[in-house]
Amino acid sequence: GYQWFDLENDNPNYILDEFLKAERKLTQFLDEVKNEYKVDNNKIVLSGFSQGCMMSINVGLTSEKPFNCIVGFSGKIINLDDLKNRRKNFTDTLLIHGDLDDIVSPTHLLEAKDFFLRENINVETHLIKNCGHHIPIESSSIALNYILKKIK
């Protein structure tokens, strides 16, 4: 499949560097879309699966202005210290993870929840039973209901 950055390399400095390059590209793309369509962050929901979740969390929380919300599936925070140092807002976040995920360990859901709580960011988390590294219908329903509440 497609990936934003290479997670096969286990050097944390390399991973963070590659991640930040991808983050800059995504931020630039979002800025272009916001300018073209005259839309503000508070009207945008950032969402992603796996690395897309990781990107959504970082881009969402390091933006000058908060987004409507972040919805992440089966991801993690790439570097807790980096995000803590660069966080600029308190965008509400929903994180969903499968308990049988063998690609991105479900322990990362707990690490992310701890980070959000320590940073006083509203976070809702769901650990889906008997779920590997994919998005089941249950997760989609949870996410849809969350987004519908946020965009009203």
Protein language model features and the residues they cover:
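Serine-hydrolase catalytic machinery in alpha/beta-hydrolase-like enzymes
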Residues: 1-39
